[in-house]
């Protein structure tokens, strides 16, 4: 299996988010959601650390409250704790620091559904560079197993279950909408 032409990566201009398209069995490219990409990365990272004997004691995965519960299933099935934070990498990084400084766990991966991924100890924020490197490494490893990333995603569904997702956008126009959003934000950050 060759990884050539099996996936396409794209980043935003400031390289903090990365998206991926994967070739399906019918030869077409499919855009993966941030949730799907995160689950693939989490499952791969867990397996890679287990295969190499580099899984830390008390391993942890972090996700935001709007990120798929499939991540929790992947983590807990493989012996990791999984914690939720509010949306935003500020909260993910704070939780990582708090857990690790207290000796309560070592975070191996953190993400949110909006295509942001935090790996390793290099950057305490979403980072498309380390994520792209890990996605490419993952694609190469699966190619060595005779699988594409699409095959790997389907295998994750078979192993952990099928999860649906739907994004809802609420529009609150005008001054009244601004007041409602502002009050909600203030209450959430008290």
Regions flagged by a language model, labelled:
Residues 47, 120, 163-165, 188-189:
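Generic signature of intrinsically disordered, low-complexity segments enriched in small/polar residues
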Residues 1-5, 184-189:
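Conserved small/polar residues in nucleotide/adenosyl-binding loops
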Residues 4-159, 173:
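Phosphate-binding chemistry for phosphorylated carbohydrates and sugar-nucleotides
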């Amino acid at each position: 299996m060759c990884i050539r032409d099996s996936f396409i990566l794209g980043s935003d201009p400031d390289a903090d988010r990365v998206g991926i398209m994967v070739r399906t069995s019918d030869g077409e490219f499919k855009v993966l959601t941030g949730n799907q990409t995160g689950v693939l990365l989490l499952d791969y990272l867990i397996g890679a650390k287990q295969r190499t004997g580099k899984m830390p004691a008390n391993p942890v995965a972090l996700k935001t409250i709007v990120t798929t519960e499939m991540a929790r299933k992947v983590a807990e099935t493989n012996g990791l704790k999984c914690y939720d934070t509010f949306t935003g990498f500020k909260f993910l990084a704070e939780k990582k620091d708090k857990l690790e400084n207290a000796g309560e766990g070592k975070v191996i991966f953190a993400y949110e559904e909006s295509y942001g991924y935090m790996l390793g100890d290099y950057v305490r924020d979403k980072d498309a560079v380390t994520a792209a490197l890990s996605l490419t490494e993952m694609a190469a490893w699966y190619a060595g197993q005779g699988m594409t990333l699409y095959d790997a995603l389907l295998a994750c569904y078979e192993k952990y279950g099928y999860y649906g997702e739907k994004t809802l956008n609420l529009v609150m126009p005008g001054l009244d909408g601004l007041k409602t959003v502002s009050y909600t934000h203030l209450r959430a950050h008290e």
